[in-house]
């Protein structure tokens, strides 16, 4: 009957709402704080075109909306551009999750590998837990000081009575 030793380590989980830089997250350009020798350790879960996601999510609703319009000036030709230029909505949102800091959870340590596993598990269930946040870009970075996860998503709602019946919304 072997005894098990239980070790309890306290760490903070930080969740930040970011501006979102898909090009940085997918490493289309490399920031100064990136260690290029560790980039191969990153996990790119998905990296879809946001415009393609908009077509998939909203084209049917856009057609229904436009078909009902009697005035040509009320029709929307490009829903993505309409939202991109809107003052009320953003085309997408980003959250960044990190456990601990560069001292307690360095990417190059055992604790960093633990953070990687925890963040990976968190991502694996994210879309199922959040069906109205359509993830189009998600990346786990192991090439910076601390492992962290970027999740970029388009929030949407269905069943709206005004405007498009399926539309961008973080509020609903």
What is the meaning of each model-derived region?
Residues 1-172:
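N-terminal nicking endonuclease/strand-transfer module with a His-rich metal-binding environment
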